[in-house]
Amino acid sequence: PNILKGYSYVNIEDNRLHPMELNKLAQDSAIGLSGVQYKFAVNLDHKKKEIQFTDNKNDIYFIKPYNKQRCTFKGRGNNDNYIPYLLINEHLFMTMARDFGFDIPYNAIVKEGVDYHYIIKRYDNYAGIKFDHTDFLTFIGKSSKHKYDIKFNELKKHVFDLINEDDMLDLYKFLVFSVIIGHGDLHAKNLSLIYKSSSLYEKELRLSPFYDIATTKIYGKNVDSRDIGLNIASRVKKFFNRKDLIEVAGNMSIDKALAESIIDKYALRFLNDFKNLYVDTLSNEIKSLPFYRLKGYRTADTLEVVLLRYLEKRRKDIKKYLEVEIKKEEEKTTAQMLFE
């Protein structure tokens, strides 16, 4: 993980990081992951270790502050809005996606108070030159309230003819990756196409870098726990199986044997690498962050335990639904992984 240590905030007051009206909204309504995101432009100076608020349209970084209400657990009362460490979650899976070979913008986390803010580099602005991009939902011609309701045939009709074979394969790989990690908040506004150049005469569209990647599987009943938010199967379903992903490949003109190999390769890599390369490499401070249970006595686990429990559950689901062959000795419990 890329943790910015020793950085100071310049011209960024607390009310900009944590707007009172946003905290009030989070406190009063259960709006899931999509409604949590808030960001503003910053300048990132690595030499001075400064994060500075800016209204310069050419600055190339955004900061997404954590929401105080989302990481506050109430010992008594309603915790429907308890979605802690979302930005650590996002940074972790953005890093994994990058390592899997996907085009991912630079991103990092920086501590402030009880949680971490998230910084990401814009992919549509290079040295002040803007590259126009359009999300899939806009191509389809629907409003934001329909971002989870898009049918696969709509993608096929309005988007797939606009991209080349290489990008189509990358998109399929990303859909498989998203199912494997449980990216339940993937929707039609989280995927976009960008023009290859900034020329007024440019007509070629390419798949944009991927962004807003996180697992919803660690938040229990407080968020939609589907394997993937985008409706790419023949019907809405919580768990995607191997047959679903092979059917999607066929609809994207991707060879069945290639699709089979992608499913197996990505699933096994995720299962083999998640603990060693992503959980174990977190700082002890992050691993020991308290993560409260929503059921039972509402005791707190650590973030490390929650992530390992998630891995154990994903291993079972991947074996059951994606029919990936997993060696018996690799089927470890959370406790076994914790004390390795």
PLM segments and residue spans:
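Phosphate/dinucleotide-binding and metal-coordinating scaffold of catalytic cores
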Residues: 1-340
